[in-house]
Each structure stands twice: as structure tokens, then as C-alpha cells.
Amino acid sequence: MVFSSLIFMCIFLPIVLIAYNLSKNLTYKNTVLIIASLFFYAWGEPIWVVLLIFSAFVDYINGRIIDKYYARAGATIALVSSLVINLGFLAMFKYSGFFIENINTFLHTSIPNPNFKLPIGISFYTFQTLSYTIDMYRGKTRVQKSFLGFLAYVSMFPQLVAGPIVRYSTVASELNSRRVTADDFAYGVKRFTAGMCKKVMLANSSGAVASMVLDSTRLTVASSWLGIIMYTFQIYFDFSGYSDMAIGLGRMLGFHFGENFEYPYISRSITEFWRRWHISLSTFFRDYVYIPLGGNRYHAIRNIFIVWLLTGLWHGASWNFIFWGLFYGVLLFIEKTLFKKKLQKIPAPICYIYTMFFVILGWALFYFTDLNALWTFIKSAFGVGTALYDLTAVSTFCTNAWLIAVCVIASTPIPTIIHKNFCKKSKVFAAISEPILVIVGLGVCFVLLVGQTYNPFLYFRF
């Protein structure tokens, strides 16, 4: 089940919200949340509910042990147990096939490939439960004594299958005591609607164009860049839209999740881009891998490449994701060692062009899982053995020029700034604009969803 589906919006969500708000106390609310979340998760593949509950139980027990034996050997054993079991499951389901396939290729062996199916959302909820046990071990959060409360945290459907990665410490107090105000609920509806509009109106439309162009067997320079630019819009509006919907749903239920995107396409450097893109993942690797390895103080270059190798692998068990991670590792290494503060002295437009050129090129590594197809695209993009443009590329651009313009504007703070300025000038506008925008936005999304067949969330596969 996906947020941008009629069954979710018309049946699942209304039933959950009614049952949740009719619940008289926190125990009932958590129970409703757990039942709804497990049903939501089981909609995709029921068997993986068992793994989800088992993972939650393992780290609930490990958390209790760490609390009991804090700063003693027992706590260390529990932390190691958490790391081994969680990362072991992740490695088995996500990476075993990739490593066996490459061992067979390079060593000419014939080890059977288990071909495990990837449990939905395992990369996200694994990091969430690890954040709990690691923070418990560091003394940065308090133990959750109720398994019901902990399972509610791990299985919470708004962010279960595609993030953002919500650390336990972020919602710990709300698991034990929360209240949904009218303002919270209204903000949640507004935020959910904004995310839905991003997904249905912009991501799906951009994705359809990107697939049509990039999957063509005859790429020109113009069509290569047009296709990957449309994919650049698709992945941003798809993932940031999902994050907006998750944040909105969380607010409707009384939870305050952190922001996951801060207009990354206005960044003036790659470093700034990663402060704005998928914030929950980049800060996770910063706090739980980069800083423990020594951060900027010891072996900074080594630490950068380790983190970005892991970041690439987190996104997928494929060479293109490894190269994508190392691609950013190299760029960040160059910025930290060679550019340092020089980028601040360069005119902003040049910095924007520099940043977006490499970001867009990076998405090619993300899009093409087949390395031969990737190499074909790179040659086409830089004019090796292909024409500059053809009539199909020109026609596709002209047909979708309006979409490109809307995507460019929507990926900046401009619409928000304009709306806030109008709200300051007119109290009447401020009072009626948001309800009207929500109603119109949801109405348009409903109409589009009825007729659309292209509706994937890209980050579901991670």
C-alpha cells in the first residue's frame, strides 16, 4: 500500500484516524497504531511482518539489558548483539546475492545464489532500531520499558517503508505522552497534501518523461540531458513528497518528525547539497559512523570514503550504487581538501551550475543499474558517437517545457516566500488560502490518481 493510492486515502487513513482519535488513552492509541501499521506493512508482503516484529523484540530486549548493565560488560554484549543481528539480517536479505554473484564471477566458482526477496523498508527500520540501542549504550536516551511502545515506534506506518529515518530519541517522549491539537492536525493535513501534490503532479509526470527518454535505444546529447534532468526532478519530488506525507501523517498522530529535505537543488556546493538532501540518512552516517571513526580530526579522508561507500551500499546492492557513493566521496574529498572556502568567493550562479552539474550527473549513476547502459548514456551525454539533437528530443522538450518550468520553481523556496508575503499583507488571504489550496490540491490529485498507472515510490526499493 502506498500513500498516493485511493485505497490508502479513501479507506485506510480515515478508518485509522477515526479509531485513533476515539481511543481514550495512550495504550489504546498505541495499539491502534500498531495494528494499523502491521496491516499497512502486510499489504505488501505479509511474511515480512514476522521479521519486523522479531527485529523490534530483539532490540527491545537489548535495550533493557543495556539499561540494566549500563557501562558494564553486559551492555557491550547487548550492543554487539544488536549490531550483529540487525546488520546480519540486512546483509543476508540485501547483499548476499550481490556478493555471491561477484564471487562466482571473479573466482569462477558456482556458489548457489539464494536470491532472497528484499523485505520492504528493512534499510530504514534497521537503522531506526540501531539508533535506539546505540543511543542507549551512549547514555543519550532512556530505556523504553513497554514493548508495545517500542513496537509502535519501529512499525509506525508513516515512515516505516521509505523514511525519513526517525531516531528513537526524537519521538521518545511522544511515545509515552502525546496530544494532537487542532493546529497539529491542520498542519499535518497541509503537509500531507503538499507531499501528495509533489508526488502525483510533479514526480509521476517527470518520471514518465524520464523513462520514455532514457529507456530509448537512440540517445542524443540533448535527449540524454533532458532525460536525466527529468529524473533529477522525479527523484526529488518523489522522495521529498513522501517525506512530506510522512511528516504530515506523523503530525496527525501527535508525532513531530524532523525535516528530511531543505531545498537541496539551491545548494552552492556538494557539501551543502548533502546537508539538505535526505537529512535523516546523512546525519545518521555522520553521528554513528563518521564521527566515531574520527570525523575531521583523525583520518578524515579515509572516513569520508568509508561513509560514502556505505551510503552507496545502503541504497542498493549493485555496482552503480557503489560508484554513486564513491562519486560523492571524491567530490566531497575535493571540496574539503582543495576548494575549502574558495567556493564562497565564487559568484553564486557559477556555484549553482557547478553543484547541479555533478548532482545531475550523479543521478545517472543512480538511474542506470546496468553498467553498460550507464556507459552508453555517458558517451551520449558528452557527444561521443551520437548526434547533438534530433526532432524527438526537440518535440519532447517543447511538449514538457511547462513541466520543467514548474519543477524548477517548485524545487526552490520561491512559492513559500510568495505565499508568506501575501499572508502578511492580507489576513483574509491568510485565513482562506491554505484550506482552498488543500482542497484544490487533493481534488486534483484524486482526479490524476484515477487516470494514472505510473505511480511508484522510488525509495521503496531501498
Segments from the language model and where they lie:
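Membrane-embedded transmembrane alpha-helical bundles that form the catalytic cores
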Residues: M1-R461
